[in-house]
């Protein structure tokens, strides 16, 4: 769970990370309890804030499994913007990655440039569909390593950290 404390005493992501001598871990974005995938952590508050701020339009890419009737009109609505509880939301891009017509669930790859709470689930719900799986595979220019097992972590190279910093014009992060 992406929280510092859980009153239900469920495991939290920060318990999996190594202890820091100075500062503390900050999550760059969060995933809700029913979402899997890439989480980024830093001890640099400026970097975290800049990467999460909507004005910087940092891309987040997801695999999305959806249950419901989906046609070209549905896809156009999701690309052009759909009303959800806190305003309008639109995918920067959305494409079918599973073309099997007989399945009740279809897989999509979608890109957003902000990270509002339950945004993807709310968007699909607005077009009478239900998200049954959601996996974040990319945040900015960092991809989820295919060989990384659920619950494991790996440290980014200094080159990857610099590339992330360059997305938001931060130097020496």
Where are the language model's segments positioned?
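Basic, flexible Lys/Arg- and Gly-enriched helix-loop patches that mediate nucleic-acid binding at interfaces
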Residues: 1-173
């Amino acid at each position: 769970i992406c929280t510092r404390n859980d009153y239900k005493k469920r495991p939290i992501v920060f318990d999996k990370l190594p202890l820091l001598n100075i500062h503390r871990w900050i999550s760059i974005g969060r995933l809700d309890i029913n979402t899997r995938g890439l989480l980024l952590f830093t001890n640099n508050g400026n970097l975290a804030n800049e990467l999460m701020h909507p004005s910087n339009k940092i891309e987040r890419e997801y695999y999305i499994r959806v249950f419901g009737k989906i046609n070209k009109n549905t896809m156009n609505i999701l690309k052009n913007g759909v009303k959800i509880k806190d305003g309008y939301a639109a995918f920067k891009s959305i494409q079918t990655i599973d073309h099997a017509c007989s399945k009740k669930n279809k897989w999509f790859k979608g890109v957003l440039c902000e990270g509002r709470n339950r945004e993807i689930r709310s968007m699909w719900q607005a077009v009478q569909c239900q998200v049954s799986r959601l996996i974040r595979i990319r945040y900015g220019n960092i991809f989820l390593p295919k060989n990384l097992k659920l619950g494991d972590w790996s440290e980014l190279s200094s080159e990857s950290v610099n590339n992330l910093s360059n997305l938001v014009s931060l130097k020496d992060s």
